[in-house]
């Protein structure tokens, strides 16, 4: 980028000097020049556009040679316990290492190779290669976001961020949970790690609440690389809809509600387009 800017500056300076000597430009205020004729302006623009095109082509070619991480399963990991993680992206079958966080921790590469692309999805969006990793985060690792960087012989990817939680903050979804009678009981403050496994599938969770409680129920999916477009609905104990929501933050869903009465409530999570599969993963959290 610096070299490109320097070349462009030198070119423009040279054209200005030539134009000034030939009388094709008139000196304006504050050292600016205005052309007498449009010929040199056209020539200047043509050269500048050529330089810009060459620079962009070179940058694109370089970007095509370095790896890129587009998603991870699971979407969140815990500290202090062994982690198995699958990354998807471009050129991950060529990685030599995965850097974890800003320290010296590196993941063990268990396997790497090509990955099947789901029908009707762009390979650049979902990734056509994958890598399976193993590592353990120190227990003192703070909650929040953690960067992962894929490295090949050609260079390193831009950092990909994954959500980190303290031990026991994550709850794994348990099947079957596709109806009120089989709803999975969850607690406030915990994060459920779930998957919409098949088309036209609904995951149902039961929550105990008190009258007057103000709750925030959120689903995180697309903003952390999932293919899922979540639709979130809250039902009361009688199975009546309290509130439903599709998109809030991008294509993810959040709803805020004050409970009218005490008792059981049911939260349903599904894809807004009735899609499903191993890449339709999500995080569900209820806070007050």
Could you describe each region identified by the protein language model?
Residues 7-8, 15, 108-120:
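Internal, charge-rich low-complexity segments
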Residues 64-116, 130, 153, 168, ...:
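Acidic, Ser/Thr/Pro-rich low-complexity intrinsically disordered segments
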Residues 157-164, 281:
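Edge beta-strands of extracellular beta-sandwich domains
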């Amino acid at each position: 980028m610096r070299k490109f800017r320097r070349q462009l500056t030198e070119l423009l300076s040279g054209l200005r000097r030539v134009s000034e000597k030939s009388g094709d430009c008139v000196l304006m205020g504050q050292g600016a020049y205005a052309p007498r004729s449009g010929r040199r302006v056209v020539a200047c623009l043509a050269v500048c556009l050529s330089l810009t095109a060459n620079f962009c082509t070179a940058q694109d070619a370089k970007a095509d040679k370095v790896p890129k991480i587009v998603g991870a399963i699971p979407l969140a990991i815990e500290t202090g316990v062994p982690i198995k993680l699958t990354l998807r992206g471009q050129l991950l079958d060529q990685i030599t290492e995965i850097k974890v966080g800003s320290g010296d921790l590196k993941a063990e590469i268990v396997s790497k190779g090509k990955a099947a692309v789901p029908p009707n999805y762009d390979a650049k969006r979902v990734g056509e290669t994958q890598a399976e990793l193993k590592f353990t985060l120190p227990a003192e690792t703070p909650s929040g976001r953690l960067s992962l960087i894929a490295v090949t012989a050609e260079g390193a990817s831009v950092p990909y961020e994954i959500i980190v939680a303290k031990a026991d903050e994550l709850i794994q979804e348990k099947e079957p949970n596709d109806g009120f009678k089989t709803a999975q009981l969850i607690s406030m403050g915990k994060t459920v790690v779930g998957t919409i496994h098949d088309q036209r599938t609904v995951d149902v969770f039961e929550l105990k609440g008190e009258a007057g409680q103000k709750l925030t129920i959120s689903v995180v999916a697309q903003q952390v690389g999932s293919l899922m477009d979540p639709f979130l609905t809250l039902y009361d104990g009688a199975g009546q809809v309290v509130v439903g929501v599709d998109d809030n933050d991008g294509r993810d869903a959040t709803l805020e509600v004050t409970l009218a009465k005490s008792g059981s409530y049911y939260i349903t999570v599904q894809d807004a387009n009735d899609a499903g599969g191993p890449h339709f993963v999500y995080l569900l959290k209820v806070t007050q």
